[in-house]
Amino acid sequence: MSYSTRQIGAANTLENRVFIEKDGQVVSPFHDIPLYADESKKVLNMVVEVPRWTNAKLEISKEEKLNPILQDTKKGKLRFVRNCFPHHGYIHNYGAFPQTWEDPNVTHPETKAKGDNDPLDVCEIGERSYTGQVKQVKVLGVMALLDEGETDWKVIVIDINDPLAPKLNDIEDVEKHMPGLLRATNEWFRIYKIPDGKPENQFAFSGECKNKKYAEEVIQECREAWEKLIFGKTSPGEIDLTNTTLQSTPSFSPSATSAVPTASPAAPAKIDQSIDKWFYISGSA
């Protein structure tokens, strides 16, 4: 199963879209890519939205047909994550698990907050990647960010092909082989919105990163929530459910690919120099 990307327009522009292709045909990274690459070995597929050390706030579009990756906007302007010293941009390869959904109608019994209406967020702690890459990963743990009153899980994973992958099998292995990384992850998620005038984010479980078993339970809950969504048992709101592979679902539409423009890649547009500024946050390490 081979995945590739179809880029429309230049990165860092409002027009830019990155579609995912499987064997040359456009698929939805939200609905068509299987959650598991190999369920018996607990190997999952992850869609990379933001490569580490970059600033553009890229995400799978829930509302557009076939859910391309695009840059988030606010009041018509492209959004970028600020650099919070000593970090630069996103500190991990950041993305999402396909075929998962954090249901905004359900309050989690332990976080006491509803889901954030997005696919499940993933932090891949290995080496550099690219937007639209479909990585095969193994789960190590999960943090529960409380983002503006919503439960926003952050699943910690490692690419199975990463040199460190054989040594990392649960969350305690991360501290052993990558000391300081979980503390830095907690700090970054806590402070990264402060330069934009927002308050510090909070965590459930006092910021503790839960282990692999707990993370797997969260993933299963979000998988079941997505299944209800895609089969029409939960109202989708503005979420586009169009897919090209799930024949038994109401929104199965293989012909939808014909409306996707042909690839038109271009060199990235220049980013304003202000995005390179470092912000020094009081109370951060």
UniProtKB/Swiss-Prot annotation:
Binding positions (diphosphate): 79
Primary localisation category: cytoplasm
EC number: 3.6.1.1
Reaction it catalyzes: diphosphate + H2O = 2 phosphate + H(+)
InterPro entries listed in its UniProt record: Pyrophosphatase (IPR008162), Pyrophosphatase_sf (IPR036649)
Lineage top rank: taxon: Eukaryota
Keywords: Cytoplasm, Hydrolase, Magnesium, Metal-binding
Cofactor annotation: Mg(2+)
Residues noted as binding Mg(2+) 2 in the record, renumbered to the chain: 121
Pfam families noted in UniProt: Pyrophosphatase (PF00719)
Residues reported to bind Mg(2+) 1: 116, 121, 152
GO CC annotation terms, alphabetical: cytoplasm
Gene Ontology terms for molecular function: inorganic diphosphate phosphatase activity; magnesium ion binding
Single GO biological process annotation from the record: phosphate-containing compound metabolic process
Protein localization: Cytoplasm
Oligomeric and partner information: Homodimer.
Similarity comment: family membership: Belongs to the PPase family.
Matching PANTHER family: INORGANIC PYROPHOSPHATASE
Protein name: Inorganic pyrophosphatase
